[in-house]
A protein has these predicted regions:
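Gly/Pro-rich hinge or "lid" segments in bacterial periplasmic/extracellular proteins
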Residues: 148-199, 203, 211-213, 308, ...
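Detector for C-terminal structural segments
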Residues: 181, 278-309, 323, 358-367, ...
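Append "and occasionally in soluble cytosolic enzymes with long acidic Gly/Pro-rich linkers
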Residues: 190, 267-368
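Aromatic- and charge-enriched surface segment that lines or borders ligand/interaction sites
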Residues: 71-114, 133, 265-267
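Ligand-site clamp/hinge motif
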Residues: 191-237, 364-367, 376-378, 384
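Surface-exposed binding/hinge segments that line
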Residues: 85, 116-158
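N-terminal lobe/hinge region of extracytoplasmic solute-binding protein
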Residues: 30-77, 85, 108, 170-171
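A structural "hinge/loop" feature
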Residues: 31-49, 69-70, 96, 141-152, ...
């Protein structure tokens, strides 16, 4: 077996457990995100961020794989069998042991559902001599990264019903759930059975608050110690507030427009390029995000170092070129100010949602910019679930959302799903490239020399820039309003954890 990764420093953390634990007031957080499910397949990231549940593999701030519930892992020489050794002594919040049998059961439930695990050629998942064995039908280099995805979090047997469906979240993290009121509120408390250093803050609550203005007021008044999901106006206001600080970090996330490649109006790459030319990305980033550097000139942001391509011709704003390209495609401006081709009007509907407050604002700006070239764009602001639903039933024309390309530490895994020939809920729709499919498969199956792998990633980025099955709009900077009484707050650039166990009150 070829060793890939081993635990470092965990024993030192265990020795520190229970030392210097200070008791203070509960921590109150507010954000726009609803707790719509307890199933890791659809809402796992919420419970890993709250540090209730763990995955086998963890990730540091730079995106490097680290031990989680697995203290080490290794693969066979042919890459077909992976062995994960579990962290000794780990226990779930109900007191049961984190055994190899339960880890295998939890991953088997995740494997049988649509999700990131289906991107790996898994033949079997089983417990063997106290370890987890994953057998593959073919080599798959990023398997450990797949097992860092929140949907693969490990829950206790008591979290599942007789059909294998998750009914409650019984994890193994430093915090355990004491109260859950879906879709709005969760309360947690410090888990005394946690092996690492005991968190200084013993109780944490999260409340869903839909309006950004309300979250801002709660942060200003001290009703919330941390407020997430701030719009640019709120950020500017809170920068003047005496009670709070604004903390920001650039994320491997892109605000993008998903296009239905089978729609008669959108199937022509020349038309998609024309629509891209009609988008003033820098203007929107400056006016709406108050951050012109976040204008997306390609799909992959600079934070995705290996995938971002500085040599790509950047996506530009050129209304005249857009008009010329649309005319060349047969679209002529009618008396109503809308493009026509015969009896057909160039009318589209864009779906988005307010969970991230900037999305409706950007959608409205797109509406105005495309109107200037004769596109009649209707904006429908609804629930985030309407975009995947529209993908599944084929009714979606355009969807505006933010996509995190590092939920799996290796972006390749996300791209294998998002760019699959069948498409994906948050990826392409009715668009495919056989050449790209082969390139992605090579990157997944083979351990390639660095230069060759870089060339393949460049080919993928170039194809996406030319074909534009997804229109990049803006890169993403996450901000939070944080009480000045809190010490040790850091935003996770990988968006995996709120790092609540690192926080203390200034009086402590």
């Amino acid at each position: 077996m070829t060793k890939i990764h081993a635990c470092s420093g965990w024993c030192a953390l265990v020795l520190m457990a229970g030392m210097n634990v200070a008791h203070g007031k509960p921590l109150a957080m507010v954000g726009p995100w609803e707790i719509h499910s307890v199933d890791p397949a659809s809402n796992g990231v919420f419970f890993t961020r709250m540090q209730v549940a763990e995955t086998l593999v963890e990730v540091d701030s730079q995106g490097n794989l680290q031990p989680g519930l697995a203290s080490q892992w290794s693969s066979s020489g042919d890459g077909l069998q992976w062995r994960f050794t579990l962290r000794p002594g780990a226990r779930f919040h109900d007191g049961s042991e984190v055994s190899a049998e339960q880890v295998a059961f939890a991953l088997q439930q995740a494997w049988r559902k649509p999700g990131v695990m289906t991107s790996a050629p898994i033949a079997s998942i089983e417990a063997h001599e106290g370890a987890l064995l994953v057998t593959l039908t073919g080599p798959f280099a990023p398997l450990a990264a797949v097992l860092a995805h929140p949907s693969t979090q490990i829950l206790a047997k008591g979290a599942y019903d007789a059909k294998g469906e998750v009914t409650q979240v019984i994890g193994s993290g430093p915090y355990r759930i004491t109260r859950l009121q879906q879709p709005q509120r969760v309360e947690t408390e410090r888990f005394d059975g946690w092996q690492g250093p005991q968190p200084a803050i013993s109780q944490v609550s999260y409340l869903t608050v839909g309006r950004a203005e309300s979250r801002t007021l709660m942060a200003e008044s001290g009703q919330a110690d941390i407020a997430w999901g701030l719009d640019p106006v709120s950020i500017r206001r809170l920068q003047q507030a005496p009670r709070v600080s604004i903390v920001s970090v650039t994320l491997p996330r892109t605000i993008q427009l998903k296009l239905n490649g089978a729609d008669p109006l959108l199937k022509d790459p020349a038309v998609r390029r024309a629509l891209s030319l009609a988008i003033d990305r820098r203007g929107m980033a400056a006016a709406l995000l108050r951050d012109p550097e976040m204008a997306a000139t390609q799909l992959f942001p600079p934070t995705l170092g290996e995938w971002h391509q500085p040599g790509l011709t950047p996506l530009a704003y050129d209304v005249k070129a857009a008009q010329a390209a649309l005319a060349a495609a047969g679209w002529l401006l009618g008396a109503d100010g809308v493009l026509h081709k015969g009896e057909e009007r160039f009318a589209l509907t864009l779906r988005t949602f307010p969970d991230r407050p900037e999305l409706p604002l950007l959608a409205t700006a797109l509406q105005a910019q495309w109107k200037a070239v004769g596109v009649d764009l209707k904006v429908a602001v609804g629930n985030s679930s309407e975009i995947p639903a529209g993908h599944q039933d084929g009714s979606l024309q355009l969807g505006l959302y933010a996509r995190n390309y590092a939920l799996v530490p290796d972006p390749l895994v996300t791209l294998l799903g998002d760019l699959a020939p069948a498409g994906a809920d948050w990826g392409v729709m009715n668009w495919q490239s056989p050449a790209m499919e082969q390139t992605l498969a090579r990157l997944g199956k083979e351990t390639l020399p660095a230069g060759e792998a870089a060339a393949l990633r460049r080919d993928i980025a170039t194809t996406l820039q030319q074909e534009l099955p997804l229109l990049p709009i803006a890169w993403y900077r996450q901000s939070a309003a944080v009480s000045r009484e809190l010490k040790g707050f850091e935003l996770d650039p990988q968006e995996r954890s709120y790092r609540l166990d690192k926080l203390t009150w200034s009086a402590q």
